[in-house]
Amino acid sequence: MSLNYLLILCFYSVILEIIARKPEIDSLKPIINVEQNESFQLMCGILKGTKPIKFEWFKNGRKIVDQSGISIDLKPTSSILFFDNILVQHSGNYSCHASNSDGSDQSSTILQIKGSFLF
């Protein structure tokens, strides 16, 4: 008795297509009111987009860098602008800009600081 074996080899071809997507920012509120002399944070989060994503913050069109009382925390899909003690002079138009190799997005808010006045 002879045994015949049929060996069938199946090869599967998998094609993985990576589609890069530009970042899409979760929009900031148009206007934010904050009391003076409080700590405050402004968060910029990504709804979708291919990593790595580069974040930048701007105040009135000028890039913000870490400075005394203001710091920037960067994560893979978000960035937080921290104010240790927010003052009236921090009022202005703030923008978060997110970019990757496929494009960019930005969102802006007007930050209004309520000061205490002594008469």
Regions found by a protein language model. Name each.
Residues 2-6, 10-119:
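Immunoglobulin-superfamily
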